[in-house]
Amino acid sequence: MKKSAWGLVDAFFDKYDLVDHHIHSYNDFVSNRIQEIIDTSEPIELEQGQYTVETGKVTIEKPFIKEADGSKSKIYPTEARLRNLTYSAHMSLEMRLLKEGGSETEFEKVHIGELPVMLKSEICHLHGLGRDELIEKGEDPADLGGYFIVNASERSIVTMEEIAPNKIILERIGEEDEKRARAIVTSIRSGFRARISLEYRKPRKTGVFLRISFPYVPGELPLVILLRALGLATDQEIITSISDDFNYQMIAADDIQVSLDKLKLDSDKMEEEMDEEERREYLIRSAIKYIGNRVAKGMTEDYRIKRAEDVIDRYLLPHIGTEPDKRLEKAVYLAEMTEMLLQVISGERKPHDKDHYTNKRLRVSGDLMEDLFRVAFTSLTRDMSYRLERSLARGKEPSVKQAVRSDVLSENLKHAIATGNWVGGRAGVSQLLDRTSYMGTLSHMRRVVSPLSRSQPHFEARDLHPTQFGKICPNETPESPNCGLVKNLALMAKISEGSDPDEIEEVIKKMGVIN
């Protein structure tokens, strides 16, 4: 290699560290995402006394330790290792208790818990220190950070490889001669993940071709019934929204006929007693009632309808929105998804390659800590609400400071990082840092793990894919069942950051590209 090329490599590593993706992601989590989680969490309302707890700004201090004599002093990572401590930061949140009809009170700072600190992040005492200063603090100046110290153990959060969220993935299923295909979307909003699966298969007897499943609805629903519930009331609206192609329209028409029988409509009443608008409302309400019978069987009709609407709004394609006015937008999205699925069945469109790196996303420390903090903060607010309710029931004056148990949040965060058992039932998300050698440590910090089961073959997922070139190391993967499922980032690979689609849309609107 020419001297100039080595100079380029040196310049790259002078600017970018091998663990930058972890540190930058964690910094974003601390600076922005914690406050966003608190701001968007459900309000804390008490049943008794009509009280509401209002939250304000969160404050995160750099790590310190309180000694037995009450004095406070900075704590550095080396001391945490030697004294069997967790290297963590003190978190305070502005809170106030508001009573309906009462005067507003001032915010008070309440200690809500301890946040494990990533070494070399912005809230770490080692951030920005030079070589001599690091040596003075008992640290290896060549250590890049990017890991945690929990109960004196060094723990690293591994990068998780997942299917791209909020994107339609088309695949063929079953035998090659079977006309079966599926469209899947992993819809994500505010930490909630909803897997929506739309499947085409030939009905055994008098069933439908197109079936859809999504969270909190037992079994599968006929697609056209769901489209009606979302606002595409008439047969014509459903058919034209799915496709302009006559063959695809005929498949939809067959499903419409079967679904009408399932809805048990009063045809005479529709023809004789209703105008066009009333017929639309009747069809939409009948479809919602059908879904309600699935999600709240045996309950009153009003409750079934309310529950069905709640499930549709909150758990069907939440990335589009969770408000009732987003239903029609969801219907259009599902109709487009249906046409793509039918094109796969007819051979007009190729199914997606799930192993193509366009269809993958990497979740690093900040993303995984965000999931963990959201669940931990929800546990804290529930516990606080319970304690406040109990105080009111005993006739005591409620106090936010006394109601908050900081160990609820602290233990949730610490336990997950210490054991690797994450929210959502995932295991092995954090691991004991490999200190066999310096190269082993760097390798561990750039590890990428697939969530697929090690006991299954998954031949295609384990194979080296051409789109991994320059992103994933083609050589570094372990033998044993982990082969091909545990990978490493290429030496000069960088992980780009996702952007908020709402912000992008706003910029495009300002440029006059879309109305």
UniProtKB/Swiss-Prot annotation:
Top enzyme class: transferase
GO cellular component terms listed in the entry, alphabetical order: cytoplasm; DNA-directed RNA polymerase complex
Subcellular location: Cytoplasm
GO biological process: DNA-templated transcription
PANTHER family per UniProt: DNA-DIRECTED RNA POLYMERASE I SUBUNIT 2
Function, in words: DNA-dependent RNA polymerase (RNAP) catalyzes the transcription of DNA into RNA using the four ribonucleoside triphosphates as substrates. The Rpo2 subunit (Rpo2N and Rpo2C in this organism) is implicated in DNA promoter recognition and in nucleotide binding.
Name the UniProt record assigns to this protein: DNA-directed RNA polymerase subunit Rpo2N
Organism: Methanothermobacter thermautotrophicus (strain Winter)
Lineage per the UniProt record: Archaea, Methanobacteriati, Methanobacteriota, Methanomada group, Methanobacteria
Gene: rpo2N
